[in-house]
Amino acid sequence: YYQTRLHMCHVSTRGAIEAIQMAKLRGAPVTCEVTPHHLWFTNDTCDYRVNPPIRTADDVQALIDAIRSGVVDAIATDHAPHSAEEKARPLTRAPSGMVGLETSLAVTLTALYHTGKMELTEIVRRMTVNPASILGLSKGRLALGNDADIVIFDPNEEWTVDPEQFASK
């Protein structure tokens, strides 16, 4: 057993969460992230082709519980847009992925904040401070010497997702 850092991307199942939790309890330097779409969609409510696939309601609940308990360190987009022509191909020939960059905050707020499952400050931490810390970047917080990246938003503003308005397609 080596003390090598490991970051698990796009964790999406209860089993993966359990394995990560066990590794952390043993002191392994493991971090992980989940995607907003794996916190909101379930395989019985949508038929999106993403990798890893959209999972069961039980898996979604396990991810949410793991975020709340601190097992999950970050919430990060799996931004993988494809053209309409690519996505219209038969399932076995279509690339997996979905636009995530422009919807990640809204989906996360819908799944966690507006359902009362997580405070806004914790969501912001998991989407900014923690990812920057994991990657060793001078970002994610307003501090002397850090990049002054800032987003101002109204967590209660409602809007309709319109793919025609996306900057990334």
Give residue spans per PLM region:
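Catalytic metal-binding/acid-base residues of hydrolase active sites
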Residues: S12, T35, A80-H82, E158
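Short, surface-exposed loop/helix-turn segments at secondary-structure junctions
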Residues: Y48, L91-T92, T160-K169
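Histidine/acidic residue-rich metal-binding segments in metalloenzymes
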Residues: Y1-I75
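His/Asp/Glu-enriched, well-ordered alpha-helical/loop segment
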Residues: Y1-Q3, Y48, R68-S69, D73-I75, ...
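Short capping/connector residues at structural and topological boundaries
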Residues: D44, P53-R55, D59, S96, ...
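Glycine/Thr-rich phosphate-binding loops of Rossmann-like dinucleotide-binding domains
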Residues: A16-I17, W40, S83-E85, T160-V161
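Short gly/ser/thr-rich secondary-structure transition/capping motifs
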Residues: A57, A132-L135, K169
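Short amphipathic alpha-helical segments
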Residues: I20-Q21, K87-R89, E164-Q165
